[in-house]
Amino acid sequence: MSNELPWQVWTPDDLAPPPETFVPVEADNVTLTEDTPEPELTAEQQLEQELAQLKIQAHEQGYNAGLAEGRQKGHAQGYQEGLAQGLEQGQAQAQTQQAPIHARMQQLVSEFQNTLDALDSVIASRLMQMALEAARQVIGQTPAVDNSALIKQIQQLLQQEPLFSGKPQLRVHPDDLQRVEEMLGATLSLHGWRLRGDPTLHHGGCKVSADEGDLDASVATRWQELCRLAAPGVL
């Protein structure tokens, strides 16, 4: 059997469908190129797009305006707070620096016032002394002296009789002796006082001598007392 086929191994047929060949589908009458213009929008779409852009712009403007205003307000507030704080610190520092100066000025004013008060007292005392000295000069040069003051002085001494014991002796200037005798002789005798003339006394003065001591009412003594009262600490 020479015409017989050679021996081959049997294999089953492939049951999978045959692969399809991809053929690009071309759109009918449509050619896409880079220069192809975009499709035109309708009026409604254009309006919506413009509104969206306006909203975006308004949002950006509002944000920028708010940011600028916030910065400005913050700057102004910071400036005012800094100014107030600086002013307060400056005032406190100025008060601290001026406190010693103010205290020194108060001390100077007080010392100046005390000086004026002392000067006023000295001036018044000096004027009083000058007036008393002028009066003494006038009285010393006057030939006639009014004895009314001496009479009143002796009457006051008589009212102080309980201060004297025994028989007090009243001495006056010899030129005043007659006037005192005429005015108070009887009263002096009634009280047991003795009247004597003393040339060492000035006109208008008198002295009372008793067991307890002397009471000096002479012009010289009264003059010294007036000067002492007019200028305390000087005499």
Swiss-Prot record:
Q: Identify the main location.
A: cytoplasm
Q: Which residues belong to the signal peptide in this entry?
A: none
Q: Where, subcellularly, is it found? A: Cytoplasm
Query: What keywords are assigned to this protein?
Result: Bacterial flagellum biogenesis, Bacterial flagellum protein export, Cytoplasm, Protein transport, Transport
Q: Which Pfam families match?
A: FliH
**InterPro entries named among the record's database cross-references:** Flag_FliH, Flagellar_FliH/T3SS_HrpE, T3SS_Stator/FliH
Q: Name one GO biological process term.
A: bacterial-type flagellum-dependent cell motility
Which terms does the record give in the GO molecular function aspect?
cytoskeletal motor activity
Protein's UniProt keywords contain Transport = yes
Region ranges (Disordered): 1-22
Please give an example of a GO cellular component term from this record: bacterial-type flagellum
Briefly, what is this protein's role?
Needed for flagellar regrowth and assembly.
Family statement drawn from the similarity comment of this UniProt entry: Belongs to the FliH family.
Per its record, how is this protein called by name? Answer: Flagellar assembly protein FliH
Which species is this UniProt entry from? Salmonella typhimurium (strain LT2 / SGSC1412 / ATCC 700720)
Q: Coding gene?
A: fliH
